Amino acid sequence: MLRRVGRTTCSPAACQLRHTTILSVRKGDTVVLLGDRQVTLGERIVAKSSACKLRRINDDVVIGFAGSTADAISLMEKLENKIGEFPNQLTRAAVELAKEWRTDRALRRLEASLIVCSAEETLEIDGQGNVITPEADGIVAIGSGGTFAKAAARALIDVDGYDAEKIARKAMRIATDIDVFSNEHWDVEVLKRKSEKQEGSEASAKTSE
């Protein structure tokens, strides 16, 4: 487990880092990623539903970000390139991005955190360039409402009849009710792990082509 190191000073971009809620919940064969759409500048809310903080790289990977939008987009583009270099190796791609983030003088100035999900893996890449795997419960959250969202999701994870999406939506509702820098306008991405039968069918289809 990696300890996050707080900064003693805070640039506008770094301050933005906490002004949102991004939550990922994994249960069974499903992983869900939610992000609110509120935009803040410093301590001022400038838009309540205009910013999509989730991005689907391809059919297999989705990313949520907290922080400066421009910085996050730069990092997501870098990660997309790494995923292209290391297909089906999400952890390897994330680690390679983290190495570059730590060593490149320009990248070191970028202020953002990412949650990256595939059907098989969930990772957090923090503002220090660390790659962090979630606890055994598969729940990850970042942003100012992240602590509330994570706590709520953990309380709901074992409730009978609650699938990953229902848990995530309920936890997100609780978090955004508490956190003034997050709101009830969300984007949602869902990925499902393919069964062996589905993978076999797809492989057969490709072979026949």
Curated annotation (Swiss-Prot):
Q: Which Pfam families match?
A: Proteasome
Key words of the record:
Hydrolase, Kinetoplast, Mitochondrion, Protease, Threonine protease, Transit peptide
GO BP terms, alphabetized = mitochondrial DNA replication; proteolysis involved in protein catabolic process; rolling circle DNA replication
Q: Where mainly located?
A: mitochondrion
This protein's superkingdom? Eukaryota
Record's catalysed reaction(s): ATP-dependent cleavage of peptide bonds with broad specificity
What does the function comment of this entry state?
Protease subunit of a proteasome-like degradation complex. HslU recognizes protein substrates and unfolds these before guiding them to HslV for hydrolysis. HslV is not believed to degrade folded proteins. The HslVU protease complex functions in mitochondrial DNA replication by regulating DNA helicase PIF2 protein levels.
Q: Which PANTHER family match?
A: ATP-DEPENDENT PROTEASE SUBUNIT HSLV (PTHR32194:SF7), METALLOPROTEASE TLDD (PTHR32194)
What's the protein here called?
Answer: ATP-dependent protease subunit HslV
Where does this protein come from, organism-wise? Trypanosoma brucei brucei (strain 927/4 GUTat10.1)
